[in-house]
A protein has these predicted regions:
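N-terminal glycine-rich phosphate/adenylate-binding segment common to multiple enzyme folds
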Residues: 1-70, 74-75, 164
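Glycine-rich phosphate-binding loop
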Residues: 1-11, 135-171
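Generic structural signal for well-ordered, non-membrane alpha-helical segments
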Residues: 10, 14, 18, 81-89, ...
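Solvent-exposed alpha-helices and their adjacent loops that cap or buttress functional pockets
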Residues: 41-45, 98, 129-130, 150-153
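Flexible, glycine-rich phosphate/dinucleotide-binding loops
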Residues: 58, 113, 146
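Glycine-rich phosphate/diphosphate-binding loop of Rossmann-like nucleotide-binding domains
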Residues: 70-143
C-alpha cells in the first residue's frame, strides 16, 4: 500500500496528493478494468474491457493560474508530450499483446484540441503501424466514445486515453 485514503478539497485548498505521487514516482499508466460479474444482472453481459490512462500529463498536470486578482477568471494548461504519448500507447499495445486482446481504441479530441489532441492521436497512429496485423487499431473522438461506451460496450477491448478522458471513461 502506497498511502491510505485521503481526499482533495473541491475547488480550493491543496492540490491532489494523487497527482503529486504520480508525478514524483512516474506512475504513468493507470490500468482500469471494467468487467461484468457473472450472475449479477445488468444492462449488458460479458463485458470485459480495459481503460489505460496516461497518468502524468494532460489537464491534470496541475498547471493552473488565476488571470486576475478578483479570481473571476482562471486558466488551466494541458501538457501532452511525444515522450509520454509514445510511452502510454506502447504500453497499451504491449498490454494488449501479452493479454491476448484484439483491439485498441485511442480516445482523443483532436478535432478541437489540434495541438495536444493532435499530438496524442498522431503518435498513436504512428505506433499502431508497428503493430499492423497484430492488433486492430481504432481512434475515436471522446464525445462519440462516451456514447458508444454506453450503447455498445462490447465493441471495445483496450481503450487508451489521455489523463482526463481516461479518468472520465473509467469512472
Amino acid at each position: 500500500v502506497l498511502k491510505g485514503p485521503c481526499t482533495t478539497p473541491i475547488s480550493e485548498g491543496f492540490r491532489s496528493i494523487n497527482v503529486e505521487l504520480r508525478r514524483q514516482l512516474d506512475l504513468y499508466a493507470n490500468i482500469r478494468p471494467a468487467k461484468t460479474i457473472p450472475g449479477l444482472k445488468g444492462r449488458y453481459e460479458n463485458i470485459d474491457l480495459i481503460v489505460i490512462r496516461e497518468n502524468t500529463e494532460g489537464l491534470y498536470c496541475g498547471e493552473e493560474i488565476w488571470l486576475n486578482d478578483e479570481k473571476t477568471a482562471a486558466k488551466s494548461m494541458a501538457l501532452v508530450t511525444t515522450k509520454a504519448s509514445e510511452r502510454i500507447v506502447r504500453h497499451a499495445f504491449k498490454y494488449a499483446l501479452s493479454n491476448k486482446r484484439k483491439k485498441i481504441t485511442l480516445v482523443h479530441k483532436a478535432n478541437i484540441l489540434k495541438y495536444t489532441g493532435g499530438l496524442f492521436l498522431n503518435t498513436g497512429r504512428r505506433i499502431a503501424k508497428e503493430y499492423d496485423g497484430k492488433i486492430e487499431f481504432w481512434d475515436m473522438i471522446i464525445d462519440n466514445m462516451c456514447m458508444q461506451l454506453v450503447l455498445n460496450p462490447h465493441k471495445f477491448d483496450v481503450i487508451v486515453a489521455t489523463n482526463l478522458f481516461g479518468d472520465i471513461l473509467s469512472d
